[in-house]
């Protein structure tokens, strides 16, 4: 546009792209920040729900810590002969049996194992197959003895040992399938005079049901109590508990010292695999207490030349677990 003086005034509107770029960059950073924390929150929620012990387990652990003074026995420290007070044991059983976890054991089942641990001469050697809701309970009840856990999931074993460094956990790889139980048990019975004999060092065993990849010292310990609550046995393609029950039977029969008897507990006894392997390797004449969920056997050590797990004697009188 021209004015009266003949000069041309041009007005320029400058657009500064930096302002737009700065606004866009800020929004992107804000979006990335919100997205990151949303993902972290969801992962934390899922991971906590699936793996962190329940509130009741934590309460039981807290009670145990108070009772034991927060100390745990080690190989370098002497083990005293004192036992947990009855009130502390009852508190542990109470909290553990009232968990919201649908897979927890009943009070009667836990008390049966607890009673045996209380009568066990210290230092008591306890071997447990499986990390479960009751893991901290077993460790606490046997606080003056040695407690070792065998777990099929190496990642969960590492995680559990990280948050509970006082727990001794070893992972093992099972090569069996639950649907192979009948075939494997038959083969083991046929080889009872050779690689699947009841008295042997499983570290050098070729028996398919024997666990031979545990730490060496596990085979050297004279176990007083063995509890089979793992591995997974409720799925057709799961490993089943044939190997853990067979291994428990051999460890009990192969003791070199300590007391001549070993208490072996088998959980989920109502299932076919647990009942079959219990009958064949732990033997009905050794069954002293049972219900649908828990069986309690008492096994004597055997002569090294033994070739039979069971002697065929009449079954003992069996009491019922409440």
Swiss-Prot record:
UniProt main location, coarse: Golgi
Tissue expression from the record: Expressed in rosette leaves, stems and siliques. Expressed in the xylem.
GO cellular component, one term: Golgi apparatus
BP-aspect Gene Ontology terms: plant-type secondary cell wall biogenesis; xylan biosynthetic process
Residues spanning the membrane: 28-48
Subcellular location per the Swiss-Prot or TrEMBL entry: Golgi apparatus membrane
Protein keywords: Golgi apparatus, Membrane, Transmembrane, Transmembrane helix
Pfam families: IRX15_IRX15L_GXM (PF21729)
Phenotype when the gene is knocked out: No visible phenotype; due to the redundancy with IRX15-L. Irx15 and irx15-l double mutants have a mild collapsed xylem phenotype, irregular secondary cell wall margins in fiber cells, uneven distribution of xylan in the cell wall and a lower degree of xylan polymerization, but no visible growth phenotype.
Bilayer topology annotation: Single-pass membrane protein
Task of the protein: Required for xylan biosynthesis, but not directly involved in catalyzing the addition of sugars to the growing polymer.
Name of the protein described by the UniProt record: Protein IRREGULAR XYLEM 15
Gene designation per UniProt: IRX15
């Amino acid at each position: 546009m021209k004015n009266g003086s003949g000069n041309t005034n041009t007005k320029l509107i400058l657009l500064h792209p930096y302002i737009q770029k700065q606004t866009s960059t800020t929004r992107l950073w804000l979006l990335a920040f919100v997205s990151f924390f949303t993902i972290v929150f969801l992962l934390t929620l899922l991971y906590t729900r699936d793996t962190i012990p329940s509130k009741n387990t934590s309460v039981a652990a807290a009670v145990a810590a108070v009772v034991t003074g927060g100390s745990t026995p080690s190989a370098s420290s002497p083990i005293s002969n004192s036992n947990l007070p009855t009130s502390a044991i009852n508190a542990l059983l109470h909290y553990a049996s009232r968990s919201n976890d649908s897979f927890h054991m009943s009070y009667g089942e836990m008390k049966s194992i607890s009673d045996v641990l209380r009568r066990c001469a210290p230092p008591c050697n306890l071997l447990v197959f499986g990390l479960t809701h009751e893991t901290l309970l077993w460790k606490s009840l046997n606080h003056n003895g040695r407690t070792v856990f065998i777990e099929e999931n190496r990642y969960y074993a590492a995680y559990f040992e990280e948050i509970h460094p006082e727990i001794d956990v070893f992972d093992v790889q099972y090569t069996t399938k639950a649907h192979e139980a009948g075939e494997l048990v038959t083969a083991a019975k046929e080889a009872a005079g050779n690689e699947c004999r009841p008295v042997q060092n499983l570290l050098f065993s070729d028996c398919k049901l024997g666990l031979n990849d545990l730490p060496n010292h596990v085979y050297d310990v004279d176990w007083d109590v063995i509890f089979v609550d793992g591995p997974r046995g409720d799925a057709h393609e799961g490993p089943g508990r044939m190997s853990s029950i067979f291994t428990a039977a051999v460890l009990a029969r192969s003791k070199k010292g300590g007391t001549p008897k070993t208490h072996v507990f088998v959980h989920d006894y109502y299932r076919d695999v647990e009942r079959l392997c219990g009958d064949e390797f732990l033997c009905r004449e050794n069954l002293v207490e049972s219900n649908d969920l828990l069986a309690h056997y008492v096994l004597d050590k055997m002569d090294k030349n033994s070739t039979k797990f069971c002697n065929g004697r009449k079954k003992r009188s069996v009491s019922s677990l409440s």
